Amino acid sequence: MQDLHAIQLQLEEEMFNGGIRRFEADQQRQIAAGSESDTAWNRRLLSELIAPMAEGIQAYKEEYEGKKGRAPRALAFLQCVENEVAAYITMKVVMDMLNTDATLQAIAMSVAERIEDQVRFSKLEGHAAKYFEKVKKSLKASRTKSYRHAHNVAVVAEKSVAEKDADFDRWEAWPKETQLQIGTTLLEILEGSVFYNGEPVFMRAMRTYGGKTIYYLQTSESVGQWISAFKEHVAQLSPAYAPCVIPPRPWRTPFNGGFHTEKVASRIRLVKGNREHVRKLTQKQMPKVYKAINALQNTQWQINKDVLAVIEEVIRLDLGYGVPSFKPLIDKENKPANPVPVEFQHLRGRELKEMLSPEQWQQFINWKGECARLYTAETKRGSKSAAVVRMVGQARKYSAFESIYFVYAMDSRSRVYVQSSTLSPQSNDLGKALLRFTEGRPVNGVEALKWFCINGANLWGWDKKTFDVRVSNVLDEEFQDMCRDIAADPLTFTQWAKADAPYEFLAWCFEYAQYLDLVDEGRADEFRTHLPVHQDGSCSGIQHYSAMLRDEVGAKAVNLKPSDAPQDIYGAVAQVVIKKNALYMDADDATTFTSGSVTLSGTELRAMASAWDSIGITRSLTKKPVMTLPYGSTRLTCRESVIDYIVDLEEKEAQKAVAEGRTANKVHPFEDDRQDYLTPGAAYNYMTALIWPSISEVVKAPIVAMKMIRQLARFAAKRNEGLMYTLPTGFILEQKIMATEMLRVRTCLMGDIKMSLQVETDIVDEAAMMGAAAPNFVHGHDASHLILTVCELVDKGVTSIAVIHDSFGTHADNTLTLRVALKGQMVAMYIDGNALQKLLEEHEVRWMVDTGIEVPEQGEFDLNEIMDSEYVFA
């Protein structure tokens, strides 16, 4: 018999050591790449020490101002560089070379070369800003770590500009002796201005080699001790959290619960946040929160071995079903053929262009773009495939146990999170499919069978249809035969891979086939399901705002009002955008469209609208901007969502092309180097200008509510105070964001860094307070809804519960109980008064002041209608 307690202690030791190994591996990758300055400890040192060195450089400059006599040769050159930039470059080079046995002279020359490059390419950037920005963007996209490569690319760019523009002169290299003096001067300033505990951080030392005295740099002993302590401390901060094989310790205080060993448990509090504030969040203050979290921790899970067996074969055979392929999208052996004739492939830039015909040059440009897209997609593929391997490995490890458990904790808004780095009920499709409830429950009644069928329909992709249609489709004989085939041989009958949630659907297929077989044998009552049937909110944030403001329009859009079929708010916004775009497709020559710096009219406008029509204006395009609206999204974040949509289309086409052994097709006509109006920037601006106002045409409640909350946050900041209010669960949400002054140092080729400066820490940041207030408020309320719902389920005897913020799951036969709790708790939260009025009054009473802020009026929507809505959670 297994000693599960002893095993749990061993697992937590592995979690602790796993976090250390992960940290050390990350840092070692930086060192191996020659970028020791990018290790965690050196990044910290850089940010702290730039300021004193910059002051040292300024003192050096001031020393010779107004002095008679000849100034040092280095001075004139250092006047061309900002102090902070020179300090950053110097320390970054020193840190990269410190442990390479480089001599003091070699380090000095490298520093000077980087300083020269900064001056040189700053000149280029000032003369051809847009062009150089494209060069830097291209370098960033290539993800190169090689400074030499970046330097060579910039030199080619400089040459190209000089050949086109007679007013721009090519760079004349600084003499070597000048470089040595510049580098030596900066190293002397570094030694004399940067201290730690009264000792210089960097100091020169000497050693004899072959009869010669060689000077080199080293760090002081105290800094070495600090680095060692930093490594040990940071490495232990983030254990590789994993499931438990015995129930986690119940939370009794904000600091006592969760994992079983001190070294792991001490890294997690029940609630993230300021320790002084967290102390207030006791069981007495919020008993329902403790009750809900501990119930979630007691839910028994187990590995779904059927799904595990399939995904292991998918990985072994690299089939790519529902997961990234394990074959690189692009590498040295698998790269699109270079269209440039072999005899010209060694040429670069303008020299290459002169040797090619216009058609060949365009083919070359297209090839470069295709390779860049593939390399970007490959980076993501590699990361995702590695995550799959880690997840499957952990599932294999825990498949030996009958039951496993998860530790839960909360963020500062009381949102609930599983504390597991890989395998988790809050994971992606594969992660959720690899888990199932330990408890198996029957599907005997009509209601239980209905929800079991609806679960399969949802996972397949019929979640926008009525419940009756979903059930009917699942009971269709042809669909049943497909599910039986899949369960019998999922690697031959692969229709499951095309489902909306492939692996969760596969898990359901295994159970459905078993159920059908038992029905055929007249033993249906023996069937037991282990799968959670999830009930998801319809854009939860907008649901909460619409409920608290009793907004009829919003309530209908997000299914708070009863309807014959589920309402699709993302699709509704997409339809508004489609109509607007259609008008521009038929626009006359007099019609103009302006967004930011982009103005389109006539032919240009029609072409842009037609391009988007061919790409497809779908709910996928509008989903993220709509979904994030209640959480503080802006027009700028809307534009970022449009970019993400296009990038996602490109990545999917690239992956499909590799799987089919062909060149990827273009999914859109937008190109950076086009001379017309169909550039990516213009396309993103155009679509953003259509989507952003369309959202407010469909829903208004979030906008007026967020405006009022921001006003309250501004009022608090003007008083130099934060916000603090009590959620329906008793959780006290505190928001107090202090101003910090951060100076970002930017270089042309060596990246940038935020340096921390000594600032007053008692000033509230007004802009940050206003930006965070509305998202925190609505997150706090949807988290409260989750906690209150879980408490009701516990009271009704439900012990198997899955939650992911606005998604709730339990067994099919308990789903009706869950749905009643979900709807009832939503009504109870808002039926008694106005949540926004309570928020305002709580602060006015504490501040003893009338803020003058007006609370938005509530509408006519009857909250009790929620109880009759079939699709509010579906």
Swiss-Prot record:
Q: Name one GO cellular component term.
A: DNA-directed RNA polymerase complex
List the catalytic activities from the record. Answer: RNA(n) + a ribonucleoside 5'-triphosphate = RNA(n+1) + diphosphate
User: Which EC numbers does the record give?
Assistant: 2.7.7.6
Q: Name one GO biological process term.
A: DNA-templated transcription
User: Keywords in UniProt for this one?
Assistant: DNA-directed RNA polymerase, Nucleotidyltransferase, Transcription, Transferase, Viral transcription
Q: Which residues form the active site?
A: D536, K623, D806
Database matches in SMART domains: RPOL_N
State the PROSITE patterns in the record. Answer: RNA_POL_PHAGE_1, RNA_POL_PHAGE_2
List, alphabetically, the Pfam families matched: RNA_pol, RPOL_N
Q: Which InterPro entries match?
A: DNA-dir_RNA_pol_helix_hairp_sf, DNA-dir_Rpol_C_phage-type, DNA-dir_Rpol_phage-type, DNA/RNA_pol_sf, RNA_POL_N_sf, RPOL_N
Q: Keyword check for Transmembrane, yes or no.
A: no
Q: Name one GO molecular function term.
A: DNA binding
UniProt key word Transferase? yes
Family label: Belongs to the phage and mitochondrial RNA polymerase family.
PANTHER family given for it? DNA-DIRECTED RNA POLYMERASE, MITOCHONDRIAL
Q: What does this protein do?
A: DNA-dependent RNA polymerase that catalyzes the transcription of viral genes.
Protein name (record): DNA-directed RNA polymerase
- Organism, by scientific name, is Enterobacteria phage SP6
